[in-house]
């Protein structure tokens, strides 16, 4: 790696350790020419699948879109922003680990609903009402009854 101070081509690694829960490698380096020290972070370059929308269009996966959907569902609910970030990161990692090139948006919606069911049941019902296009109160009632049954069986 070139030195960011003098642009010399030779640097040596002084120290390496894992960072951000093992997702990155932090390296302390020293320039062989000017003796300046600097830190670099190394991450794997992973490609996320393209999302197949319900109309057949394809778009790149967008963490922020998932985060916005979660924030909207969790609006005025007692859930920390760190919990939202954890859900986004978990879905991101899961999709990366699967290694598929394309994924239907409906599958991402189901992943979000499962995460919300564990995180906050009110937010789950909110999200489900939009995601599944509830038309009347009966649809809400049915979803809540399913949720109550699932909670009792646990």
Swiss-Prot record:
Its cofactor is Zn(2+). Keywords: ATP-binding, DNA-binding, Metal-binding, Nucleotide-binding, Repressor, Transcription, Transcription regulation, Zinc, Zinc-finger. Residues 49-139 form the ATP-cone domain. The keyword Cell division does not apply. One of its GO terms (molecular function) is ATP binding. GO terms for biological process: negative regulation of DNA-templated transcription. Transmembrane segments: none annotated. It comes from the Bacteria. Binds 1 zinc ion. The keyword Metal-binding applies. Belongs to the NrdR family. Negatively regulates transcription of bacterial ribonucleotide reductase nrd genes and operons by binding to NrdR-boxes. HAMAP family: NrdR. This is Transcriptional repressor NrdR. It comes from Hydrogenovibrio crunogenus (strain DSM 25203 / XCL-2) (Thiomicrospira crunogena).
């Amino acid at each position: 790696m070139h030195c960011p101070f003098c642009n010399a081509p030779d640097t040596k690694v002084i120290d390496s350790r894992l960072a951000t829960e093992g997702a990155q490698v932090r390296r302390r380096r020293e320039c062989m020419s000017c003796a300046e020290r600097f830190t670099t972070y190394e991450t794997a370059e992973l490609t996320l699948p393209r999302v197949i929308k319900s109309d057949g269009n394809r778009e790149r996966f967008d963490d922020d879109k998932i985060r916005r959907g979660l924030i909207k569902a969790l609006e005025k609910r007692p859930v920390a922003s760190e919990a939202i970030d954890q859900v986004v990161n978990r879905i991101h990692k899961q999709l990366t680990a699967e290694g598929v090139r394309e994924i239907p948006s409906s599958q991402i919606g189901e992943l979000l609903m499962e995460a919300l069911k564990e995180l906050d049941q009110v937010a789950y019902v909110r999200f489900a009402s939009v995601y599944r296009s509830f038309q009347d109160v009966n649809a809400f009632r049915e979803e809540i009854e399913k949720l109550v049954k699932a909670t009792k069986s646990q």
